[in-house]
């Protein structure tokens, strides 16, 4: 069976085609701006403009036609309303024109589900991106969020800090490179509340210290990363202890950061459990994870009526009953 998935919750439009155990195509295009950030209207226009070219590219790479596709999947939320609506409209049009079943997929769940293509069974997932920071795991037939940011996503915090430093967007790789040259830890606010996190205080203080001119920028970047990532690892370890699961996966755009990977690897090795990070193109926002999750849902007997495909900007992970 083959599934086609369309992802477009934020600034990346991705289209993926997968079989039950293989990614046949995974193409994307990301809207970038000089100042960073995402304007919902601009994201929607970007997705609408590139939908047809990316669809053609995905079909060409996979060597299939739309007639060969068994199910159409799309990111139903959470995300930016205008961008989500472009994606849903395209998915509906394909489903109707080619008479295919359609499935709406929760974006956050898809980030964790794609790891199961690689043999992961039942993990605790640390999902870190621009807009989302969550620790989630399957419990009682649903993905439960055991901890999350109470204010801004870690990726957003890093990007704002990078913009303050004049590094441009996206800031993650540039902050990471600076941090590698850091020699001294500068104390910054560390906010963990149970299994929830807060990054706004850390960001504000890091910017204040930078503007004071008293600190090396490399040391600030190093300290920012160490503080934020230590908090992420702490709440992940608490979720592991609570759920007694023996696998941890790291997903989302910030999963590209080597220091975060290293800190999680140390924690999981200390606990004697498995740690997995998918290839980066399957960590970032992508259509393949939507296609794969949609295919698993469809095989379990799930398909949507068109009136059920309305987008959900605040689509919680625990709204979805996991029956696959």
From Swiss-Prot:
Binds 1 Fe(2+) ion per subunit. Keywords: Acyltransferase, Cytoplasm, Iron, Metal-binding, Transferase, tRNA processing. The keyword Iron applies. InterPro entries: ATPase_NBD, Gcp-like_dom, KAE1/TsaD, Kae1_archaea_euk, Peptidase_M22_CS. It is found in: Cytoplasm. Its cofactor is Fe(2+). GO terms for biological process: tRNA threonylcarbamoyladenosine modification. Pfam families: TsaD. It comes from the Archaea. Changing residue 127 to F: Loss of iron, but no change in DNA-binding. Fe cation binds at residues 107, 111, 127, 285. GO terms for molecular function: iron ion binding; N(6)-L-threonylcarbamoyladenine synthase activity; single-stranded RNA binding; tRNA binding. Its EC number is 2.3.1.234. Substrate binds at residues 127-131, 159, 172, 176, 257. It catalyses: L-threonylcarbamoyladenylate + adenosine(37) in tRNA = N(6)-L-threonylcarbamoyladenosine(37) in tRNA + AMP + H(+). GO terms for cellular component: cytoplasm; EKC/KEOPS complex. It is an enzyme of class 2 (transferase). Belongs to the KAE1 / TsaD family. Required for the formation of a threonylcarbamoyl group on adenosine at position 37 (t(6)A37) in tRNAs that read codons beginning with adenine. Is a component of the KEOPS complex that is probably involved in the transfer of the threonylcarbamoyl moiety of threonylcarbamoyl-AMP (TC-AMP) to the N6 group of A37. Kae1 likely plays a direct catalytic role in this reaction, but requires other protein(s) of the complex to fulfill this activity. In vitro, binds tRNA, ssRNA, both single- and double-stranded DNA, and exhibits a low ATPase activity. The ATP binding pocket identified in the crystal structure would actually engage the substrate TC-AMP. PANTHER family: TRNA N6-ADENOSINE THREONYLCARBAMOYLTRANSFERASE (PTHR11735:SF14). Monomer. Component of the KEOPS complex that consists of Kae1, Bud32, Cgi121 and Pcc1; the whole complex dimerizes. This is tRNA N6-adenosine threonylcarbamoyltransferase. It comes from Pyrococcus abyssi (strain GE5 / Orsay).
């Amino acid at each position: 069976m083959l599934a086609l998935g369309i992802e477009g919750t934020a600034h990346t439009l991705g289209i993926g085609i997968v079989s039950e155990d293989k990614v046949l195509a995974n193409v994307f295009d990301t809207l970038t701006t000089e100042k960073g950030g995402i304007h919902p209207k601009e994201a929607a226009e970007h997705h609408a403009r590139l939908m047809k070219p990316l669809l053609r590219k995905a079909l060409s790479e996979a060597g299939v036609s739309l007639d060969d596709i068994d199910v159409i999947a799309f990111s139903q939320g959470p995300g930016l309303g205008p961008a989500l609506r472009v994606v849903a409209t395209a998915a509906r049009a394909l489903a109707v024109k080619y008479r295919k079943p359609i499935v709406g997929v929760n974006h956050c769940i898809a980030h964790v589900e794609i790891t199961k293509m690689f043999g992961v069974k039942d993990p605790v997932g640390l999902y870190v991106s621009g807009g989302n920071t969550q620790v989630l795991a399957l419990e009682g037939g649903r993905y439960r969020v055991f901890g999350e940011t109470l204010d801004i996503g870690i990726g957003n915090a890093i990007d704002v800090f990078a913009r303050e430093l004049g590094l441009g967007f996206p800031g993650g790789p540039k902050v990471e490179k600076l941090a590698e040259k850091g020699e001294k830890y500068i104390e910054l606010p560390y906010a963990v509340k149970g299994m929830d996190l807060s990054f706004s205080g850390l960001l504000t203080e890091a910017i204040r210290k930078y503007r004071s001119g008293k600190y090396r920028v490399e040391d600030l970047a190093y300290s920012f990363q160490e503080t934020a990532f230590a908090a992420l690892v702490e709440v992940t370890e608490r979720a592991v202890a609570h759920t007694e699961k023996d696998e941890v996966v790291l997903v989302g755009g910030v999963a590209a950061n080597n220091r975060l990977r290293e800190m999680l690897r140390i924690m999981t090795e200390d606990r004697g459990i498995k740690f997995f990070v998918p290839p980066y193109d399957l960590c970032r926002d992508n259509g393949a994870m939507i296609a794969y999750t949609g295919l698993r849902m469809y095989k379990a007997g799930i398909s949507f009526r068109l009136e059920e495909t309305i987008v959900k900007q605040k689509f919680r992970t625990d709204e979805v009953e996991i029956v696959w």
